[in-house]
From Swiss-Prot:
It catalyses: alpha-D-glucose 1-phosphate + UTP + H(+) = UDP-alpha-D-glucose + diphosphate. GO terms for molecular function: UTP:glucose-1-phosphate uridylyltransferase activity. GO terms for biological process: polysaccharide biosynthetic process; UDP-alpha-D-glucose metabolic process. Coiled coil: none annotated. The gene is exoN. This is UTP--glucose-1-phosphate uridylyltransferase. Keywords: Exopolysaccharide synthesis, Nucleotidyltransferase, Plasmid, Transferase. It comes from the Bacteria. SUPFAM superfamilies: Nucleotide-diphospho-sugar transferases. PANTHER family: UTP--GLUCOSE-1-PHOSPHATE URIDYLYLTRANSFERASE. It is an enzyme of class 2 (transferase). CDD domains: UGPase_prokaryotic (cd02541).
Length: 301
């Protein structure tokens, strides 16, 4: 294997409308909805930074200015917190502030699909491999999924995707990969199928919204015809790229919550709250009481 090029940059698409969360997302971007006390998009940024990413490219759209503000300095707020003696909160805000020049924003002017959103980052990524994190998919575990992708990428190079296992009967809901030869940090991908027909999935490993892709994907996406939903689909582009470059998959050892769905969003809030040292115990007691009360009502019905 040739020496792999360092992955320094990550793309985070944040241009979606969040219609599944209306009316909450009428004025607030879905990426700014909170899991406990930080917005969904912050989890993706933290995961990327923990994996060694140096520069993050947000692909945004109109009415998303609040995302830029979130990752900017807030001197008035810091001054107010300082006068109140809230040094712990100041430290937390300063820790999440990106270094100057390490965050860029570009626009996706029309909602033409994930593949098109990725293509919109081409000039800011340049001729480099890059990570791609879908912020709706929130990693929960001892380490983020991208860190594991980095391990696999340094082992095999090429293109790398994050996967998890679903129940076989649910494979038709996801993008599924076929499992090939096993390597230390994952396995080779033999095929990729978007939402296969029932009983036709090559495995039960589904794509969990984390990728490391080579820059050749941009030229493919530039000329790709529209696919499902009349949109430019990333999976279609990856299928074309797989004809000339290798793909490997890293099975994530944690769990990914789909926070683009109401169920996944609620589950993520409960999971992250339970894991918190400051509120975990009391949340556990509250959730347990609610579950027991709910079960009692069901039995009494």
């Amino acid at each position: 294997m040739d020496r792999v090029r360092t992955v320094r940059k990550a793309v985070i698409p944040v241009a979606g409308n969040g219609t599944r969360f209306l009316p909450a997302t009428k004025a607030v971007p879905k990426e700014m909805l909170t899991i406990v006390d930080r917005p969904v998009v912050q989890y993706a940024v933290d995961e990327a930074r923990q994996a060694g990413i140096e520069h993050i490219v947000f692909v945004t759209s109109r009415n998303k200015q609040v995302i830029e503000d979130h990752f900017d300095d807030a001197p008035e707020l810091i001054s107010s917190l300082s006068r109140s003696g809230k040094s712990a909160q100041i430290s937390e805000l300063e820790a999440m502030l990106p270094a100057a020049g390490s965050v860029s924003f570009t626009r996706q002017q029309a909602p033409l699909g994930l593949g098109h959103a990725v293509w919109c980052a081409r000039d800011l990524i340049g001729d480099e491999p890059f990570a791609l994190l879908l912020p709706d998919m929130v990693s929960f575990g001892a380490r983020g999924c991208v860190a594991g992708l980095m391990d696999l990428y340094h082992e095999v190079g090429g293109n790398v995707v994050g996967v998890e296992q679903c129940a076989p009967e649910e494979a038709s809901k996801y993008g599924i990969v076929g499992k090939g030869e096993t390597v230390r940090h994952g396995f080779s991908v033999t095929e990729m199928v978007e939402k296969p027909a029932a009983g036709k999935a090559p495995s039960n490993y589904y794509l969990n919204g984390r990728y490391i892709l080579q820059p050749e994907i941009f030229s493919i996406l530039a000329h790709q015809t529209r696919g499902a939903g009349n949109e430019i689909q990333l999976t279609d582009g990856m299928l074309t790229l797989s004809q000339s470059q290798s793909f490997h998959a890293h099975p994530y050892e944690g769990r990914t919550f789909d926070c683009g769905s109401k169920q996944g969003f609620i589950e993520a809030n409960v999971a992250f709250a339970l894991a918190r040292a400051d509120i975990g115990d009391i949340v556990f007691e509250s959730v347990r009481d609610m579950v027991l009360s709910h079960e009692s009502r069901i039995r009494a019905a």
